[in-house]
C-alpha cells in the first residue's frame, strides 16, 4: 500500500488482501464525510463514493453494511433532484452518446473526440468498425432474445461476422452508428447497480432485508419487462446474479461476480469459442494475474503469485 510520497530508494513491502480492503474501506468511509452531494459531471461526489463503498462492502462479504448503505443510497437518490432509474420507455436512448451523464449516472469517465485514444478506446474495442469481435456471447444473446418484452434486448443489434449471425452490444454508441464510438463515456457507477447490490446482500441476509431486497430486484426486473416479476420462492443468489448479467452486461462485472461468490465459470462454445464447453473453478490460479517480472528487480524478496514461476 502506498499512502505517502515514496522516496527514490524506498521499497514498500507487499500488503495482504485484507490490508488492501481495510485501506480502501477506511479511505472511502472518510471520503463520504468530506465530499459534496452536488452532481459534477465527470467527477466523484458523495453519491458516487457511497456507491463504490457499497460495492466494496459486497465484495468484502460484509452484507449487512452493503445492504444498509445501498438501501439508504437508493432512498436518498429517490428524494434528490439529480438521480433516478432510467424508465422503461427511455432505457435504450439513455445509452446514446447524446445522453451522457444521465439520471442514473453517479460517475462515468468523460471522453470526447478531442481526447479519444483512438484504437485504444473502449468503444473501438466493442464496435463492428473496430476489432469486429465486440459481440455478446451466444448464451447471452439467446437469453435476451427469448424475452422480446425486455427492453434491454433492444441494445443488441444483429450483424454478420465471418458468415455467422452475431449480436453487437450497443451500450457504447458512436454519434451516427456508422463510425467507431470513440467519444462514448465509460460508465463506472450507476444507480441500477446499487439496486442490485441491495438485492444480493438482502438475499444473503434473509429476513426483513430479503423482503426489501426482493423489492429492489423487481424494480430492475420490471423496468426491463413490466410483465416480469420474481417471487420470493425464486429469489436466490443465482437469480440475482442472472439479473446482474442482464443489466450490467458490458460494464465489467460478470467475471468478478462469479469469482467472489465461489461460482464455476462456464464458457460455452459459440461465436467466440470452440464448440467444446470449458469450466474454470473460481480458485483456478490463472484467475489472478502474475506479478510482472520487472517488479522483482526492485523487490527480489517478493513472492510470485501461486502457480506462476518467478523468472
Annotated model-derived regions:
Residues 1-124, 133, 145-311:
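Acidic/polar-rich alpha-helix caps and helix-coil junctions
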Residues 128-142:
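Short, cationic low-complexity segments
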Amino acid at each position: 500500500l502506498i499512502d505517502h510520497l515514496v522516496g527514490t530508494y524506498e521499497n514498500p513491502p507487499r500488503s495482504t488482501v485484507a490490508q488492501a480492503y481495510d485501506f480502501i474501506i477506511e479511505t472511502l468511509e472518510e471520503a463520504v464525510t468530506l465530499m459534496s452531494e452536488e452532481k459534477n459531471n465527470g467527477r466523484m461526489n458523495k453519491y458516487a463514493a457511497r456507491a463504490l463503498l457499497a460495492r466494496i462492502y459486497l465484495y468484502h462479504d460484509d452484507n449487512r453494511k452493503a445492504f444498509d448503505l445501498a438501501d439508504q443510497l437508493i432512498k436518498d437518490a429517490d428524494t434528490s433532484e439529480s438521480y433516478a432509474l432510467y424508465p422503461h420507455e427511455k432505457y435504450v436512448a439513455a445509452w446514446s452518446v447524446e445522453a451522457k451523464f444521465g439520471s442514473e449516472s453517479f460517475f462515468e469517465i468523460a471522453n470526447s473526440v478531442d481526447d479519444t485514444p483512438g484504437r485504444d478506446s473502449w468503444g473501438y474495442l466493442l464496435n463492428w468498425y473496430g476489432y469486429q469481435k465486440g459481440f455478446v456471447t451466444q448464451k447471452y444473446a439467446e437469453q435476451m432474445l427469448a424475452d422480446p418484452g425486455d427492453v434491454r434486448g433492444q441494445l443488441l443489434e444483429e450483424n454478420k461476422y465471418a458468415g455467422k449471425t452475431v449480436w453487437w452490444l450497443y451500450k457504447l454508441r458512436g454519434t451516427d452508428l456508422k463510425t467507431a464510438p470513440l467519444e462514448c463515456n465509460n460508465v463506472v457507477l450507476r444507480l441500477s447497480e446499487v439496486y442490485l447490490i441491495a438485492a444480493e446482500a438482502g438475499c444473503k441476509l434473509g429476513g426483513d432485508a430479503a423482503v426489501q431486497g426482493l423489492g429492489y430486484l423487481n424494480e430492475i426486473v420490471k423496468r426491463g419487462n413490466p410483465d416480469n416479476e420474481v417471487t420470493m420462492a425464486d429469489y436466490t443468489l443465482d437469480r440475482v446474479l442472472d439479473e446482474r448479467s442482464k443489466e450490467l452486461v458490458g460494464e465489467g462485472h460478470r467475471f468478478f461476480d462469479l469469482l467472489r461468490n465461489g461460482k464455476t465459470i462456464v464458457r460455452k462454445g459459440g461465436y467466440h469459442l470452440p464448440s467444446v464447453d470449458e469450466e474454470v473453478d473460481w480458485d483456478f490460479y490463472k484467475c489472478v494475474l502474475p506479478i510482472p517480472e520487472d517488479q522483482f528487480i526492485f523487490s527480489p524478496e517478493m513472492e510470485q503469485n501461486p502457480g506462476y514461476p518467478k523468472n
